Structure formats: C-alpha cells, structure tokens
Amino acid sequence: MKKNPSRNVHFSKGPSKLLDKINVSIDVDQRLFKEDIAGSIAHAKMLGKQKIITKRDSEKLVSGLRSIQTDIKRNKVKFSRKLEDIHMNIESLLFKKVGKVAEKLHTARSRNDQVVTDLKLWIKNNSIELDKELKIFQKTLINVSKKNVYTIMPGYTHLQVAQPITLAHHLLAYIEMIGRDRSRLKDCLYRLDENPLGSAALAGTSYPIDRLYTTKELGFREPTKNAMDSV
C-alpha cells in the first residue's frame, strides 16, 4: 500500500473509500479556478520582484498559469478527482506546462493562506456581481410601482385581509428590504477587502515578501494585520 505522507504519523492504514469520496472537493471548488490562478500569479510576480526566485522563473510561472486559465476557459481541461481539489489540479497542470519550476510557486506560501485568499476573492467578486443584480431588481420594482400607483390590492396581516393598499406600496416595501441586503453586502465587502496572502501556514514567513505588492495586484484595500487571525 502506498502511504500518504500526511497520514503516516498517526495512521497505519489508508483511508476508507467513503472518506476519500468526502475529501474530494473538485466538483465544488473548481469554480475557484480564476481566483486561485490570480492569487498564484500575484505571488509568483512578487517572488520575482523580491528576488526570492529568479525573474526568469517568475515569468515562466506567470506564463504557465495564464496558459492554464485560457485552457480552462476554452474547456480544454478535464479536472481529476484523484487530485482532490482545484489547487492540486492547477499545480499538476502547471508542472506539465513548466516542469520543476512549478515547485517554486509554494515558496513563502502555504496552502492555508492560499485557500483563504481564493475564498475571499471569490466571495468578493461574486458579492459585487450580486449587488449589481439586486440594483437592477430594485430599478425594475420601481418602474412597475410607477405604473401601479393607483392599482388597488388587498393587504394581509395574520393571513387575513386587513386593509386596501396599492400595488406600488406593496412593491416598494421590497425596495427597502433589498436595500438592507445591499447594505449587508457592502459591509461584508469591506470586511473581506483585506489580503491574507503572506500569512503562510500560521505566523508568516521569514522570506522577504512584499504583502503590499500582492495586495495591490489582487485589488484588496490592505493586507490583514495578524497572520494567525488570517488563517
């Protein structure tokens, strides 16, 4: 039986088929491919800028990652369940593109800060898109309300007819509800807008990284202040 290094210390036997099935997340997290690649590109560029790796290796990594992103968008990539998640899949693809240089991408980076960065970017990007859709929905309700200022309908309370109201009054109530939801999204985006990349596995790294650089590259407002809190 081929041993898994991550399990050697505590387990003498391999995992059950059920556990392997549970651990496979590629069916879900493949949607993170753009964010995972964006984080890796920013990190690779920073490693080159800081001379932690050579400029040539940095450029090779960036080129390989961009090529992978293009392949995925063109549906040329079939993700492997054997590689469990999007991170391992992209790393495997990168190794095929650029060879052993791919191993340098994890210099000064852990899977911990990588995953948190991916998730923050994904939620941030999708929250922005969701807010745009909610704004369109509000405008649609307002337009319908303007046409129904004098349209009478029954108003209900406790599942019983209570008062005559207008359709406009009813629809405009949803404008307020959606407005509160958009305010929550705005607050969520503010809290998300901190870059955890560089926190590494737990308490940062001894490499001379530049977190302000990756923060700007990824479009975050600022880097997180405490590595342990970040991951």
Give the label of every model feature segment:
Residues 224-231:
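Short, intrinsically disordered, charge-balanced linker/junction segments flanking boundaries
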Residues 2-204, 208-217, 221-223:
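A helix-coil-helix interface module used to build multimeric assemblies
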